[in-house]
A protein has these predicted regions:
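Chromodomain-type histone methyl-lysine reader module
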Residues: 1-118, 122-129, 134, 471-476
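C-terminal reverse transcriptase regions that engage the nucleic-acid substrate
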Residues: 180-302, 439, 447-449
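Polymerase palm active-site segment centered on the conserved acidic dipeptide of motif C
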Residues: 123-130, 155-208, 212-215, 220, ...
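Catalytic palm subdomain of template-directed nucleic-acid polymerases
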Residues: 69-82, 103-107, 137-175, 192-203, ...
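RNase H-like nuclease module associated with reverse transcription
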Residues: 276, 313-314, 350-476
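Structured nucleic-acid-interacting core domains from mobile-element enzymes and related host factors
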Residues: 40, 50-57, 295-321, 386-388
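Mobile genetic element proteins and their domesticated derivatives, centered on retroelements
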Residues: 20, 36, 43, 64, ...
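Conserved pre-motif C helix in the palm subdomain of viral-like polymerases
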Residues: 53-75, 93-134, 142-168, 242-268, ...
Length: 476
């Protein structure tokens, strides 16, 4: 709690929100949001960034900062109550003036980010326009040098070993940090570099085994697919008996991080079970679906993403949608995937916010979602030194959507479509995007919009770079 010098708790204190709804609607929402706002690298930026550096055969190194937040600067006047362990050593009512940001202080992450940004600017780096967690060397006459930041976890990427040594020395002069050498792990991922093949392998087997042990599934019977093709996951009727909440939400949270980083094969099943995390909305069938995913994870814990490669790395994009496949709401599922070379670096599986009237309409919706991601990916690759030589190609398997975008005419069946969903059509008219047809069998985005059988799931996972890396290990 922040106090005034007189000890009045109401002078500087900002109450902690009790729920997310209160956090974004209360009168204090802007204050605590700004205080806590520290840039963190999105996983899409991380995978794209690592993929390009592997293909260029750059060196990847990382430092380790000690007491990170204490190295920031505090610009506000903040007073603290005397900790209970010191009450006997100081007079009653003693207040302490805080000199440095400490862990638990709302603005500590922001202060550390500002301090680090100032340090990197002094070393000749500037923020990327596409991602505020990516820093680029400002002197274009020198060899490229990139720094990716996630709070206090940094990744250096460059082929200039002399500059790498100088940057490390500059950070050690200004902050308390040690050099960890070549990158081996990052944010819970195990990283294996193959300089000969110019590939980087990302696995999360250690975290998977922790999750399986936590819920007692380390010795469970294996499952070939995470979700059966004829599943019946839907909202339960209101008069049905309620199952106890238990660790349902913990299941979803643990698997969500795995899916975000390396296991895109869990995207669609997780998007289904995550709709029923509210107590009283999930039933036995939803519990069984989560348990099946853990059994599937147990049998595929050795799988990982293989980024990079010596071949020509081209950004490919696929978009797909399944019309009205939600049994309870009749809403549709959309998804996209962006691959660099033979490995996916960005993916999404989501449900439409409202009911869509036709497969053409849901195709337009999915195309707009993919077009938004395409614009950002183009900016990110441009900052990474990869300028597109020709308009990127978006592959879809919806012929009606392709015809509507190419003919550019309005019909009575399509005049109600919201204009904001015609982004893909607008980019095509400007020459910034090409739309191409691909058969459903070759559309890798199917894995993000529907439950697939074992053979199709394995085929699409292989096409997206999710391969068996480690032997299947059962951890006691």
């Amino acid at each position: 709690m922040m106090l005034s010098p007189e000890g009045d708790p109401d002078a500087f204190d900002i109450p902690t929100p009790r729920s997310y709804a209160e956090a974004v609607t209360s009168e204090y929402s802007s204050q605590w949001q700004i205080a806590m706002d520290a840039e963190m690298a999105s996983w899409k930026s991380t995978s794209t960034y690592v993929n390009k550096q592997a293909q260029r055969d750059y060196e990847l190194h990382s430092p380790d900062f000690s007491t990170t937040f204490l190295q920031g600067s505090l610009h506000e006047e903040i007073w603290l109550r005397c900790p209970p362990c010191f009450t006997g050593s100081f007079p009653a009512g003693t207040r302490w003036s805080l000199r440095r940001p400490v862990y638990g202080l709302r603005q500590a992450p922001r202060e550390w980010q500002d301090t680090l940004r100032t340090t990197l600017a002094a070393l000749g780096f500037a923020l990327s326009y596409a991602d505020p967690s990516l820093f680029l060397r400002t002197d274009t006459t020198l060899r490229p040098f990139y720094i990716l930041v996630c709070v206090d976890d940094l990744v250096f990427a460059t082929a200039d070993s002399e500059a790498l040594t100088l940057v490390k020395a500059g950070l050690q002069e200004r902050h308390t940090c040690t050099d960890l050498g070549e990158l081996r792990s990052y944010l819970g991922l195990q990283i294996t570099l193959d300089r000969a093949r110019r590939t980087i392998t990302l696995t999360q087997s250690h975290m998977m085994h922790q999750v399986l042990r936590r819920f007692g599934f380390q010795y469970s019977s294996p499952q070939p697919i995470p979700l059966p093709t004829g599943h019946s996951l839907s909202a339960p009727p209101s008069d049905e008996s309620v199952e106890p909440s238990g660790p349902y939400l913990e299941f979803v949270g643990c698997l969500m991080y795995l899916m975000t980083c390396t296991r895109h094969d869990l995207a669609y099943p997780l998007s289904l079970v995550a709709r029923y995390v509210t107590p009283g909305r999930h039933r036995k069938v939803h519990w069984d679906a989560e348990k099946r995913m853990l059994r599937y994870l147990c049998s595929t814990s050795g799988m990982g993403l293989v980024l990079g490669g010596r071949g020509l790395v081209i950004l490919t994009r696929h978009s797909d949608a399944s019309w009205a496949n939600d049994q309870s709401t009749k809403r549709s599922s959309q998804g996209y995937t962006f691959s660099l070379g033979s490995c996916s670096v960005s993916w999404r599986s989501t449900r439409s916010y409202f009911v869509l009237g036709s497969s053409c309409e849901v195709g337009i919706y999915a195309g707009a979602m993919a077009a938004q991601e395409l614009c950002w990916m183009t900016y990110l690759l441009t900052d990474s030194g990869e300028r597109p030589r020709s308009p990127p190609n978006l592959y879809v398997d919806n012929k009606a959507m392709l015809a509507l975008c190419q003919e550019q005419r309005l019909e009575h069946r399509t005049k109600h479509f919201a204009l904001r969903y015609f982004l893909a059509q607008e980019l095509r008219k400007r020459g910034q995007l090409r739309l191409s047809y691909v058969t459903s069998r070759a559309n890798t985005t199917d894995v993000f919009t529907k439950a697939l059988g074992s053979s199709d799931l394995h085929r699409f996972c292989t096409a997206l770079g999710l391969l068996p890396i480690l032997p299947h290990l059962l951890v006691p």
